[in-house]
């Protein structure tokens, strides 16, 4: 008879399991894309979840072409203000260094709560010789009633596409001091990667954190803990041993999330549920519906980028027959 065996409980894919350095997710890599020049990312605030009825567009599904109910996440995506441009180049060691930086002259006073000095790199830009072009954008927290903090978040978005870095630089220059919308980044039917910091659970035990098996009923003193810290040798506790500690409040990336709908702020009433969304309120700006769930609680900043490993082709249109606006308060 074969020896019974199961895989280890708890993934080793995400280590160390510590709190994120910032509540704002960080995009560490950008995929290369083809086609016209465009911005490769966007950001919004998580509102909550509801469900929609739609025609199943998945050709290999058993319900292909039939109406189905699916859960969706509502993300409020007000326009982003383009407040600066950065050009990057590689040094001898392959590190990306800033070689050109320019800020708009029309800076909102709210930005000085985040950055006290705006230093420009005065080197004359020669885009053809550089490696990357980024937009420096700021969120409009003051236009979102559901967000308690009115201090804007400032971050970079890569510009991709086109035939040369010069085209991307011209695109960035044309948008400096203006705003960009979600439609400049993506549209319904396309995939995006979603980055967010998950809900924080605090200090939790072995069972909740790793899903290890409960010890027998007659075990001495404890049941909700591990049976051993490891072998005698090596004579230290290895990091593969499941132990109690921080759970949640960690950055995660969800790949290939389908955009089901995008709508302008004038049509916000088409998504506001009865009584408002829990812990958020009402949507007042542009919003987008994403298939399924995304990490993080309501009000958290959510970043999106072009998919890095897309496996399924985009579709031209998603047909939504019904959006549930029933109260989420349990009545």
Curated annotation (Swiss-Prot):
It holds the Pfam family Ribosomal_L3. The keyword Lipid biosynthesis does not apply. The keyword rRNA-binding applies. Keywords: Ribonucleoprotein, Ribosomal protein, RNA-binding, rRNA-binding. One of its GO terms (cellular component) is cytosolic large ribosomal subunit. NCBIfam families: L3_arch (TIGR03626), PRK04231.1 (NF003261). Part of the 50S ribosomal subunit. Forms a cluster with proteins L14 and L24e. One of the primary rRNA binding proteins, it binds directly near the 3'-end of the 23S rRNA, where it nucleates assembly of the 50S subunit. This is Large ribosomal subunit protein uL3. It comes from Thermoplasma volcanium (strain ATCC 51530 / DSM 4299 / JCM 9571 / NBRC 15438 / GSS1).
């Amino acid at each position: 008879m074969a020896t019974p065996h199961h895989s280890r409980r708890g993934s080793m894919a995400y280590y160390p399991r510590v709190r994120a350095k910032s509540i704002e997710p960080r995009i560490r890599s950008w995929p290369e894309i083809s086609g016209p020049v465009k911005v490769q990312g966007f950001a919004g605030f998580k509102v909550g979840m509801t469900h929609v009825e739609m025609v199943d567009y998945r050709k290999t599904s058993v319900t292909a072409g039939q109406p189905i109910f699916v859960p969706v996440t509502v993300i409020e995506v007000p326009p982003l203000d383009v407040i600066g441009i950065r050009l990057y180049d590689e040094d001898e060691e392959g590190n990306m260094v800033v070689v050109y930086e320019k800020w708009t002259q029309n800076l909102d006073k709210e930005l000085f709560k985040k950055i006290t000095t705006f230093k420009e790199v005065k080197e004359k830009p020669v885009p053809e010789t550089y490696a990357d072009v980024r937009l420096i954008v700021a969120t409009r927290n003051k236009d979102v009633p559901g967000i308690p903090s009115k201090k804007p978040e400032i971050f970079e978005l890569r510009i991709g596409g086109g035939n040369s870095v010069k085209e991307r630089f011209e695109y960035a220059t044309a948008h400096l001091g203006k705003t960009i919308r979600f439609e400049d980044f993506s549209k319904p039917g396309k995939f995006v990667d979603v980055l967010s910091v998950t809900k924080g659970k605090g200090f939790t035990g072995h069972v909740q954190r790793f899903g290890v098996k409960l010890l027998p009923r007659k075990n001495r003193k404890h049941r909700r803990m591990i049976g051993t810290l490891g072998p005698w040798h090596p004579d230290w506790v290895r990091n593969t041993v499941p132990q109690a500690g921080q759970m949640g409040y960690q950055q995660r990336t969800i790949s290939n999330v389908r955009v089901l709908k995008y709508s302008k702020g004038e049509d916000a009433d088409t998504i506001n549920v009865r009584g408002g969304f829990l812990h958020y309120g009402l949507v007042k700006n542009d919003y987008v519906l994403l298939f399924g769930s995304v990490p993080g609680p309501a009000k958290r900043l959510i970043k999106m980028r072009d998919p890095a490993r897309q496996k399924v082709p985009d579709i031209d249109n998603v047909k939504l027959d019904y959006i549930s606006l029933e109260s989420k308060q349990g009545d």
